[in-house]
Amino acid sequence: MDVWVIGGGLAGSEAALTLADLGFPVTLFEMRPAVMTPAHKTSKLAELVCSNSLGSLSTDNAKGELLFELKVLGSSLVNLAFEAQIGGDKALVVDRELFSTLVEDAVRSHRNITVVRAEITEIPKDVPCIIAPGPLIKGDLLHFLEEREGRCEAQYYDATSPSILSETIDMDYAFWGNRFGEGSDYLNVPLSKEEYYWFVEQLLNAREAHRHDFDKPDAFFERCLPVEEIARRGKESLAFGPMRPTGLAIPEKFRDVHAVIQLRKENASGTILNMVGFQTGISHTEQISIFKQLPAFKNAVFVRLGQIHQNRFLPGVVNKFFQSRTNRLWFYAGQFTGTEGYLEAIAGGLWAGINVARLLGGEKLIPLPEESMLGGLVTYIEQSLPEVKQPMGVNWGLVPPVEGKKSERKQKRVDRARIAIEYAARELGRVT
């Protein structure tokens, strides 16, 4: 019997490849293009709908540690991400289109995977399944899972940022450079104090799309706040947040620089640039109007505009193996479990895939050590209470504290996590 994988996002694609590589036949269901979501623009598998950055490459950063652990465990999508990597300072930034194409090709060409383009509304209870529908799930499947799991969905709002054709930006008002280091991965558009305050005022007065659907501040995910929400917290909030000029070597021709708008390459050729940290729910007409009043963007052509979309997840439905508490054949993966972030979604798909393979192969399910970053995340998700309303991305608070001098704790924590995940990889038979 084939293992069903529901959802062709990051988690579902990773789960399908993990199982298929282990010799299990997989049927991967993806509802696009027949049924699209508010955030997706294509029918490709593993489409990146927000940023094109998978997180930090820094060894002492929580994302960087998770990335290391996924490489140790043999993640297919992480390997493909490095194939699609473009400049990104200390982050794993990928060519959005190339990455999705590589994943699509890997999945469709695998002899053990059958891709079915159809919407699934219910799941037979005796079918081994990895449920990875993503946070944009709604309708019949959501209601089916709520009923079977005895849990109610949690809701929050996420946002995407605009992208611009690079050749339409006036370079007389911009410069390339990275914060705190060499390189030129980011295009920086400096704003004077006067321009900055004007810009903030425009954001505060702009008309928003469907504001009545998300009029409570706590409905937004804190790590992906729209710029207009940040601006409401204080006039200088953006200047000390995503628009901070700190660490940039600013050319002399730019005077009185109070803030910067940063853009990052979205593809390898650099023909499209994405605004960094500029998620917004302002109406599309107002976005174009506001940005085009800044000299650098007066002739800008926007290939994508920011928007807000509603996300959902089911807290408290899985154990430490991402296995359903109500059906031992069902496993969950991705943001629908309550994780947040691209890498976290990939991690969920990998972990669920490993455990389904072990279950069907008659092997004992082995828990991850809590000292590892992935183990800490899995433990948090397992212990999440039904009333949890916000998803969780990786951070060092998920792992147990370490003893010793403060100056030594950071490295001790990293060393301990790496020893733990390498031990787990051997136990799970994931050593390559």
UniProtKB/Swiss-Prot annotation:
Name listed for the protein in its UniProt record: Methylenetetrahydrofolate--tRNA-(uracil-5-)-methyltransferase TrmFO
GO cellular component term of the entry, any: cytosol
Pfam families: GIDA
Residue ranges of coiled coil: none
Top-level division of the source organism's lineage: Bacteria
Enzyme nomenclature, EC number: 2.1.1.74
Keywords: Cytoplasm, FAD, Flavoprotein, Methyltransferase, NAD, NADP, Transferase, tRNA processing
PANTHER family per UniProt: GLUCOSE INHIBITED DIVISION PROTEIN A, METHYLENETETRAHYDROFOLATE--TRNA-(URACIL-5-)-METHYLTRANSFERASE TRMFO
GO biological process: tRNA methylation; tRNA wobble uridine modification
